[in-house]
Amino acid sequence: MLPLLRADVEAKTALARTMPADDLIERATGGIAMGTDAEISQVVLAPSYFCRPYNLITEYPGVRLFVYPVDLAPSEAGSPARELARLFKAIGDDTRLRILQMVGEREMYLQEIANRLGVTHVTAIHHLALLRAAHLVRSVERGGLKYYQLRPETVAQVGERLRDVMGAAQVGGR
């Protein structure tokens, strides 16, 4: 497992040289965006296999630590079939579909989502973590709250991604 974690650190270090810090954080965490009002001067990104699909976030004065999930099999991580399976698992639940509908209408914070669904905030966190891992939602901090937003670019790509995985010859043919 250590080689997997080292490889992820090397990959993120290389990305850090080519992309803005906010984009790197969002990519590593699967959709967490730091708000502009965060008083953070340093960010630490640390990969973990054990917290999947959750991110563990700890804050110290001026420093925020993101422990983010990585896949065990790096050869499959990011593969189209694996990502599509994660996406369909995420939308294969009526509660998560309702969440997508709600945040598609407007961004919402956690307790607001839980209240509208009639579930505990812990249950809402579970559903939102799966949706975030599938890149269907992102969370943005603002005013001390995390707001959840639909990622319309992922929704728009579902059909195309399924066709890619199935292969052009399989789609529409018998």
Protein language model annotation of sequence segments:
Residues 99, 112-116:
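A short acidic, leucine-rich amphipathic alpha-helix
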Residues 105-109:
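Short capping segments at the starts of secondary-structure elements
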Residues 134-142:
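Beta-hairpin "wing" of winged helix-turn-helix
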Residues 1-61:
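DNA-contacting interfaces and partner/effector-binding or oligomerization modules
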Residues 110-111, 122, 129:
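Residues within helix-turn-helix
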Residues 147-174:
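Conserved segment of winged-helix/HTH DNA-binding domains
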